[in-house]
Each structure stands twice: as C-alpha cells, then as structure tokens.
C-alpha cells in the first residue's frame, strides 16, 4: 500500500513547483551564459534551509553544466557573482535570513504558499508567460 505524503510535505513540493515557474518566468535564460536549454533553478543557499528556499533573491536559472561546475566546484566565483547580482545590502539580508536558526512552522509554509500563488497569478494575469496548469494545491 502506497503511503500518502503529509500535508507539510505536499505543501513544500507545491511551493517548489510554484517557485520554479516564477523563477523560469523571471529569468528566461541562463544568468551566466544566456543559453535557453537545459535550464535548472539554482539556489545560492541550500534548499534544505527553508527560510531562504523560496526567496526570489536566493535563486536564478543556470544551465545544468554551469550549475554543477560553477556552483558546486568554484564556490568563491559563484559567491562573487551572487554578491554582484544582489548588491551588498540584499546579499547581507539574505545571508542573515539563511543563518537564522528557527523552526519553520506550518503557518509559515502556508503563508509562503499564499505569497507564491499570488505572484504566480499575477504572472498568469499579465499573460507574459505560458504557465503550466499542473501547479495547484488544495489546502
């Protein structure tokens, strides 16, 4: 018998789907090479840090090769790129948010989901992009 996922886990996965679509719509191309194929959402602070996982300042599009090579092998260059991309103030705020240790409650996940759905709906309403229809959660 297949085990059903908890509401928390489903909400995290749905937030990931919404966030992925928002980042793809925002960046459109690899932020290092400007290529348009094999794109992946790349996080500066690890995805297991839920405080920054869905922060728009914490992600950009990179090709798979650049993501693996640059972000995971040459971290100092990657960090310099991120600092230049965000500026010192936004970078410091993101770092503070990432290093702040506290549990992420269900209410936090629900609020994040609401905010992501709002951004997603705004993108849909503006007809700027063709968003996939499979991004939906019932809470």
Predicted regions and their residues:
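Short Cys/His-rich "knuckle" micro-motifs
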Residues: 38-44, 72-75
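Short beta-strand-alpha-helix junction that forms the catalytic/metal-binding core
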Residues: 29-31, 49-73
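Short cysteine-rich loop/turn motifs with clustered Cys
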Residues: 14-40, 63
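A boundary/linker detector
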Residues: 1-18, 37, 94-139
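Short edge-strand/loop segments of extracellular domains
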Residues: 46-49, 85-86
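Short, surface-exposed acidic
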Residues: 86-96
């Amino acid at each position: 018998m297949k085990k059903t996922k908890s509401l928390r886990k489903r909400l995290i996965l749905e937030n990931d789907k919404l966030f992925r679509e928002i980042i793809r719509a925002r960046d459109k191309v690899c932020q290092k090479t400007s290529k348009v194929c094999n794109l992946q959402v790349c996080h500066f602070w690890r995805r297991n840090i839920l405080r920054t996982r869905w922060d728009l300042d914490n992600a950009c599009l990179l090709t798979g090769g650049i993501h693996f090579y640059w972000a995971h092998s040459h971290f100092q260059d990657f960090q310099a790129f991120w600092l230049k991309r965000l500026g010192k103030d936004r970078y410091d705020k993101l770092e503070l948010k990432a290093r702040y240790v506290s549990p992420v409650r269900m209410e936090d996940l629900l609020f994040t989901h609401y905010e992501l759905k709002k951004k997603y709906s705004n993108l849909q309403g503006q007809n700027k992009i063709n968003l996939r229809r499979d991004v939906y959660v019932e809470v």
